[in-house]
């Protein structure tokens, strides 16, 4: 029997709905005879807004509820910001598609009184808002004179807090700002020499039930080969380090000709220890490159740094 419907599970945040509606529209163009619907829901990460993400300590903060809908047969696929999708997926589910990546860089967004400053000349004591340990650790490493303060809520809420003076500047994903129509708020794209981005940042991951070949064929129309190869290398790197979404692990990847170049880093929360290295290999074997880079960082002390962080999280 031919497939006549696809049910998409999505977070109900504004950014998630923009992303999921884009997937819906693209699938409708490719498969006009199929009825495509969205079931939006709140996840644990959406509900707990008074605790720093790192202190909640769950690798599936923004994905578990969506995955549950697929596992009980109420949804066929789930659309995620790939950076939020853990590298270990529940039994019976798979990462079926990675979409074309937006710019994965982190962005500096400033209160208007800071419009004449760049990141490297912010006055000492400036208050920088970020909910990411990865950004926090790298920026502490390079700019120990800045004050870092946790910020939660959706992008609009965060921008309101910035503009009200609660923060002097924020560090946010450029891709999310662009997708929400706030690209004009990007004051500076932070160079990768300063801040390596999150694994999968800027790409969408479409998760689906294993062994549903018809669903897999449909979503594969959105697959972007180069983005997929880069993100698979990054995810293999993260998985080998046993890291989740809330650890100070960063990456940068690019493909030149037939080669994939992957840079990765692990840092302590205070920014005083930062290990960084690069591996190059065939783009046809992205996961091998990720694993090799992780092992290189392990040999330089990465696991000792991460174990301290894991121990603090368990305390």
UniProtKB/Swiss-Prot annotation:
It comes from Prochlorococcus marinus (strain SARG / CCMP1375 / SS120). Its cofactor is dipyrromethane. Pfam families: Porphobil_deam, Porphobil_deamC. The porphobilinogen subunits are added to the dipyrromethane group. Monomer. Pathway: Porphyrin-containing compound metabolism; protoporphyrin-IX biosynthesis; coproporphyrinogen-III from 5-aminolevulinate: step 2/4; Porphyrin-containing compound metabolism; chlorophyll biosynthesis. This is Porphobilinogen deaminase. Gene3D superfamilies: Periplasmic binding protein-like II (3.40.190.10), Porphobilinogen deaminase, C-terminal domain (3.30.160.40). InterPro entries: HemC (IPR000860), Porphobilin_deaminase_cofac_BS (IPR022419), Porphobilin_deaminase_N (IPR022417), Porphobilinogen_deaminase_C (IPR022418), Porphobilinogen_deaminase_C_sf (IPR036803). It is an enzyme of class 2 (transferase). GO terms for biological process: chlorophyll biosynthetic process; protoporphyrinogen IX biosynthetic process. Tetrapolymerization of the monopyrrole PBG into the hydroxymethylbilane pre-uroporphyrinogen in several discrete steps.
């Amino acid at each position: 029997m031919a497939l006549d419907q696809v049910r998409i599970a999505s977070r109900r945040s504004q950014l998630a709905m923009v992303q999921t509606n884009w997937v819906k529209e693209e699938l409708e163009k490719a498969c006009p005879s199929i009825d495509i619907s969205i079931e939006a829901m709140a996840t644990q990460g959406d509900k707990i807004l008074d605790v720093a993400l790192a202190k909640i300590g769950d690798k599936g903060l923004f994905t578990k509820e969506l995955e549950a809908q697929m596992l009980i047969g109420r949804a066929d696929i789930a659309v995620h910001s790939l950076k939020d999708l853990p590298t270990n997926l529940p039994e019976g589910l798979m990462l079926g598609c990675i979409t074309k990546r937006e710019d994965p860089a982190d962005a500096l967004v400033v209160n208007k009184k800071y419009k004449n400053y760049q990141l490297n000349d912010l006055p000492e004591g400036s208050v920088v808002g970020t909910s990411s340990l990865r950004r926090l650790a790298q920026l502490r490493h390079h700019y120990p004179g800045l004050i870092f303060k946790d910020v939660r809520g959706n992008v609009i809420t965060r921008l309101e807090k910035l503009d009200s003076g609660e923060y002097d500047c924020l560090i946010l994903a450029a891709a999310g700002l662009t997708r929400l129509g706030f690209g004009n708020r990007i004051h500076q794209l932070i160079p990768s020499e300063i801040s390596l981005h999150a694994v999968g940042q800027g790409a969408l991951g479409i998760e689906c039930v294993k062994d549903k070949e018809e669903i897999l064929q449909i979503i594969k129309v959105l697959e972007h080969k180069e983005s997929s190869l880069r993100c698979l290398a990054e995810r293999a790197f993260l998985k080998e380090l046993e890291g989740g979404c809330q650890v100070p692990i960063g990456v940068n990847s690019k493909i030149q000709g037939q080669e994939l170049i992957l840079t990765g880093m692990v840092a302590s929360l205070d920014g005083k220890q930062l290990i960084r290295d690069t591996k190059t290999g065939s783009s046809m074997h992205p996961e091998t490159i990720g694993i090799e880079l992780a092992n290189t960082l392990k040999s330089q002390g990465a696991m000792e740094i991460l174990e301290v962080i894991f121990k603090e999280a368990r305390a």
